[in-house]
């Protein structure tokens, strides 16, 4: 997913709302001035390190490449290790920024005081499948998806699925569930949605970055889940939309609260997030209650969420931070949410 394409689902007004006063928050020292261009001698590189969610990794890597083209002395390294790892490294101050698909819980916010949440993108969690001969047309309700991941629906030709898909030839084959094996913001988004649409899921499993999966195979990262689904027949999983676009993987149309079955796309994710900027916390407050799942609207895809860049209001709390790095990080952040 390119940065230019993703502008259709980045709500710049949200970013401006949150980071409009960013220069007042991101402090290094009394001599640091926001907007003063970072300068360095030829070959005097400034290294910025980040880690976290694989959910927005295609976007983040593309942004880094674009930024380096016009800022060749600033090298931004991002490790796609999952939201749990990003939050942990942000809290431990071993990276300059983290990225998480889930906002910090109140307890995590307390462990990392003066953290900022900066929404850098809005993305969709999709349900890819691998059924030979079925490339399009599969429809699923939230309850059916929950029952599949609970291990209660075990065959592709289960009556619950075939009744909903009379024109799709579904095989008498066992469903192979693929889920994340690592702490994951994608899992948090997906399980939060399942908990909203299925009382059984809420009671038996609940929502979280890491849950006790009732069934299935584990794989690390969105890349791992996508790889297992793409290479193994009769599988089903959950991944971020960008990984489907990259691999042209079949995905299910999911039922939204208005009763429409909607395929994931940049347009339907944007529709779900429309108006999200009307009632958001400031960047320096807790975002633990923020979600945009199951948004109203006939064309709204139901499993949509922000990804958050995590920074400290005072960057000098990070042990290896210096003034050049602070300026470079601030300039990249402002570029990422404005351009």
Per-segment meaning from a language model:
Residues 2-12, 16, 24-339:
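Flexible loop/hinge segments at secondary-structure junctions
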